[in-house]
Amino acid sequence: MILDIDMLRSFYASYSESVAQAKATVKRPLTYAEKVLFAHLFDPSQLRPYKRGVEYVDFRPNRVAMQDATAQMALLQFMNAGKDKVAVPASVHCDHLIRADVGVEKDLPEACKTNKEVYDFLKSVSQKYHIGFWGPGAGIIHQVVLENYAFPGGMMVGTDSHTPNAGGLGMVAVGVGGADAVDVLTGQPWELKMPRLIGVHLTGKLSGWATPKDVILEILGILTVKGGTNAILEYFGDGLDSISTTGKATICNMGAELGATCSIFPFDGNADDYLRKTGRAEIASLAQQNAAELRADDEVLANPSAFYDQIVEIDLSKVEPHLNGPFTPDAATPISHMKAKGPANDYPMVVEVGLVGSCTNSSYQDLARAASVARQAYEKGIQVKGQLIINPGSEQIRYTAERDGILDDFKKIGALIMTNACGPCIGQWKRHTDDNTRKNAIVTSFNRNFRRRADGNPNTYAFIGSPELTVALTIAGRLDFNPATDTLLDKDGNSVKVDVPTGFTFPPKGFAVEDKGFIAPSEENANVEVVIAPDSNRLQKLAPFAAWDGKDLIDMPLLIKTEGKCTTDHISMAGPWLKFRGHLQNISDNLLMGAVNAFNGESNKVKNQLDGKYVEVSTAAKAYKAQNISSIVVAEDNYGEGSSREHAAMEPRFLNVKVILAKSFARIHETNLKKQGMLALTFCNKDDYNKVQEDDRISLTGLKEFAPGSHLNITLKHKDGSEDSFEVEHTYNDTQIAWFKAGSALNFAARK
């Protein structure tokens, strides 16, 4: 059985009472996010008015979801915990390792062959420890979770940064690293800094070409990629009624690009419909019984500024179709401005490829509305200028869309139908292009557009829009085509407009599927053997990291001083490296290969201080490690922005990097660094970043007095013999300091 019905019945039986107790304790009305948070305290007796953005709180999530690229490391860690089964319902989803090339018919069998060792490991470890397993082709983790597992008022963690997608159905769903997931899987408290609350007030109604995707693209322009850090975005207002559950999921999904802990919508009639249409009528009824507590209290809605830390006002009737990019998702541009902005910024204006799919926009409604645009091109005889690629979100969606003729609408204009998987969105794309050195533009319905992310090509300018706009721009072949005002030529040379997209929220005949691709958890797991070949280059058992030796870190060579944006894609590249996600030694060869060296402006070229030669980052790190020398990385703002991949923390730890000193950190990555026993430190004065020189030997002192709220000391020994000193700060609490001293959070847990 897919649904964990007993857990859900038990949860709803006590949910409203838990919320009532929280209100009585804090003595005020609650926002919806607060209700869910307070209802999931690991120890309810510790309930109090926690200070947002400051205090760490222990929670007890209802479930865990893992995708195949991050599940490997998470489950390798779980295997060392000595448990017979997972403590909460959990699932593994095989969606990240499938490469998009020529179409699903060839790509899926090739992926099953190429990744057989990893799939066999994940399947067997799932059977061994009572975890639901969704095989390759079953679908993208967050779409599958929304269709099968998400429920209003619940809390889940997932080893993927876009886990907040489930907030569209009213969950507090948080992306985490594997070590955090292991905490939940083993029944330990899961620690999270009490989030700030950003209220997003939606009024009016979307119209024309504007979609839910454009709502979050506009918000990204307002708040930026750092604006949601350590915050939950809670949506409220009369504008909610006009947005479907899958549309709300899209908005919550891209809250990750704001750096938000998660985003959440209240339970409403649209959520009730979605639950019933996806075969969860009992859950809908249970939610209805608790409906009063699956939303913010009336007092909150009447005076939101008294309860939220920040308010963002969005009038949906004024939202325009957006095209965000290139290279960062917060570069927000209404499509009506692109005619001026494109040439002014020297963007390549020809759209070569349009890509529809990803966990952000691959629902039935997304495909139906995008297909209505494709259908018009075919029926009106409009020549399609670019290549169109489609990735359905799940096998249920693919099967239903095929039955309803939606996929045929795409195929009629030459679209390639790829596997129900992430594909190009996370760099799993064998792009066929005639010249990799040419500046070129692609348009996607994805969530991220970092340089090199989709196709590995630094000359690709990637822009993010809705599925409908993506198809329209691909048909037009122009980045500045505004479907609301511009025309195209039909086969007879007549100017024709593309009408406003249409499409059903739910399939009129209902969802259908022959085989979802799911293997239920086994009750007979004692004899299941999890085999990892000793000579495997894909999987490697983990050895514990060494504990702190009790000494300060003296004369560390600077491994790299990064300049500008340094995301987890820069730190631990995906694409061709995904195959090594279960092998720490091998994947560490990609350490910081995408980061820009502040001293030469180049990527993956740093000075090895032992011989003065310029080498790859991992080569320098390995040289230092071979001499038992610790090293340090210095970075700018929002270091570690992007995905939840803990490899970006484990790789430097494995290669003996002890400190990451940055102007600021992205939330998930900072936690991942702490979990792996590293020191994630920030400049007290950001200008001190400029004092760091290429040949510096750097000392960190004060570690014996390392305590919450304390400062540590940095001394830079420059090549000319001069020195600079300054203080650095941190956000470690007592438990996290214990992780550092033990060598990692897992080491600390094993010693308790």
Functional labels for PLM-detected ranges:
Residues 3-4, 68, 151-285, 416, ...:
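Mobile "lid/hinge" segments at catalytic clefts and subdomain interfaces of large enzymes
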Residues 8-11, 15, 20-195, 581-633, ...:
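Long, structured ligand/cofactor-binding scaffold of large enzymes
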Residues 42, 46, 51-60, 74, ...:
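Terminal amphipathic helices with adjacent charged low-complexity linkers/tails
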Residues 47, 147, 151, 243-249, ...:
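Short glycine/threonine-rich loop-to-helix capping motif typified by GTGT followed
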Residues 76-80, 306-401, 405, 524-659:
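Non-catalytic terminal/interface segments that mediate subunit docking, oligomerization
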Residues 379-429, 435, 643, 649, ...:
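Extended C-terminal subregions enriched in glycine
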Residues 488-505, 670-739, 746-749:
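Acidic, glycine-rich flexible loop/linker segments
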